[in-house]
Regions:
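Non-heme di-metal
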Residues: 1-211
Length: 211
């Protein structure tokens, strides 16, 4: 069986980054859950929903980068497989959010390359720190993402079932990823790390909503 060199891994990482950042480059592996009939939204409602979905798309870009960075540096093969499988499932979220943004005549965040780079670096560092911390980083990330999704679900216009079905399914997946990481040996992160993660998350949500 061929062993991948460091250059091979870097090329693979670059390919993954392009697939995460280039609009339309990511295809979902599962059907889009937004099977509800299209509903008419007021201009202000559509603008707000687009902002929320843009934030959620950026969050999934961050998750992709996190998993890619961790898979590059994780020490145990089973942990690398967990990271790679989670990244595949997160691709569905990317595609679903992008589809909904297109339906709303909107766009993904122009800041996504920045969020990807930051998250990739954090994921790689977590992997270097050790698999238990890497998995703990995943669990904390998914916990924070779930909180954002639950808040966004509450903010959706009552009639917007298409966006709601997407976010509900995404939230179920995020909670599953959190539980999987904890069951695989993830540990609680130090409080300063969790606070820093929350601060970065708030910056991402506030800027990606508009840009």
């Amino acid at each position: 069986m061929r062993q991948f060199t460091g250059v091979d891994k870097l090329i693979h990482s670059f390919d993954q980054a392009l697939r995460s950042l280039v609009p339309g480059a990511t295809a979902a592996h599962r059907d889009n859950p937004s099977v509800a009939e299209k509903t008419q939204l007021a201009v202000s409602e559509a603008r707000h929903v687009a902002g929320l979905m843009r934030v959620n798309h950026s969050g999934e870009v961050c998750a992709q980068a996190l998993y890619h960075g961790q898979a590059l540096t994780a020490k145990l093969p089973n942990v690398r497989r967990e990271m790679e499988q989670a990244a595949i499932e997160e691709q569905d979220h990317l595609a679903w959010c992008e589809d909904r943004l297109k339906e709303l005549d909107s766009h993904t965040s122009l800041l996504n390359p920045i969020w990807y780079g930051l998250s990739f670096g954090m994921g790689a560092l977590a992997g270097i720190a050790g698999d238990k911390y890497s998995l703990g980083f995943v669990a904390e990330t998914e916990r924070q993402v779930s909180l954002h999704l639950e808040d966004h679900i509450r903010q959706l216009p009552e009639q917007d079932e298409r966006s709601r079905k997407i976010l509900v399914q995404m939230n179920e997946d995020e909670l599953h990823h959190r539980d999987t990481a904890l069951n695989a040996g993830g540990v609680d992160l130090p409080v300063p790390v969790r606070i820093a993660m929350t601060g970065i998350s708030k910056l991402m949500t506030k800027t990606s909503y508009y840009i």
